From Swiss-Prot:
A GO cellular-component term linked to this record: cytoplasm
Gene expressing this chain: Crk
The species this protein was found in: Rattus norvegicus (Rat)
Keywords in alphabetical order: Acetylation, Cell membrane, Cytoplasm, Membrane, Phosphoprotein, Proto-oncogene, Repeat, SH2 domain, SH3 domain
Similarity field: Belongs to the CRK family.
Tissue/organ expression: CRK-II is expressed in all tissues and cells whereas CRK-I is expressed at lower level and in limited cell-types.
Free-text note regarding domains: The C-terminal SH3 domain function as a negative modulator for transformation and the N-terminal SH3 domain appears to function as a positive regulator for transformation.
Species lineage: Eukaryota, Metazoa, Chordata, Craniata, Vertebrata
Full protein name: Adapter molecule crk
GO terms classed as biological process: actin cytoskeleton organization; cell chemotaxis; cell migration; cell population proliferation; cellular response to endothelin; cellular response to insulin-like growth factor stimulus; cellular response to nerve growth factor stimulus; cellular response to nitric oxide
Pro residues: compositionally biased ranges: 67-82
Modified residues (N-acetylalanine): A2
Amino acid sequence: MAGNFDSEERSSWYWGRLSRQEAVALLQGQRHGVFLVRDSSTSPGDYVLSVSENSRVSHYIINSSGPRPPVPPSPAQPPPGVSPSRLRIGDQEFDSLPALLEFYKIHYLDTTTLIEPVSRSRQGSGVILRQEEAEYVRALFDFNGNDEEDLPFKKGDILRIRDKPEEQWWNAEDSEGKRGMIPVPYVEKYRPASASVSALIGGNQEGSHPQPLGGPEPGPYAQPSVNTPLPNLQNGPIYARVIQKRVPNAYDKTALALEVGELVKVTKINVSGQWEGECNGKRGHFPFTHVRLLDQQNPEEDFS
């Protein structure tokens, strides 16, 4: 299902000058396909498409050739002798940002299409914290997690606290950027001895240290996949191969358990990212990030 946003409504998705760290803070923990467009801080005139996908935040550079177009571009024709600007992302070229966003409504970047812009209400919610304001804990015991909302960790791991919704359960983030709920009795408060420890957690997903807010753009950019369209169930059955094991909550009878390598018949594609399907004679819902769609033109090549 295509994204539910108006690509011509600039104010909903364009954030102007925003650092990578600020973009991560806005998008981390959002559902797959939530995105924003910002100015590149290292390449003036270019843009960056930042997207929440596969439990991380990916950043795709959008290179602009020729005069930088307005956002969205004016319908006026360029002066004689001036070539119109072109926008390139990966191997794709577009005349405007709205055209680019429309394309990725129905084509995958890596593991998701564009679903909706991040809400601007998060800008004033205190979600962006400077490192000195962050709170950390150290694990006293191993914790394997009991359900999908939990964040597993090992004894000695350093975690960054993001929120405290309950007295005994806090929301935390590990050094890989994964987030989830942790049991408070399993951890102790921890104060980093140096900035290098705090920089390790809560930074960008490419492994380089986060920069000060509004600072340079660290780390490499992701590359979009080549022309992978969102499948259309009206064209016939769609199959996918499980790439990540899933053990659903025992109390959720509508969730589908998955084992790596199993074949899933997709029966419904929801914009939320929770798809529905059949596997081993059982029907239920599952996160689409746990499967890889097979080549619908030659599915038999993947069935073996």
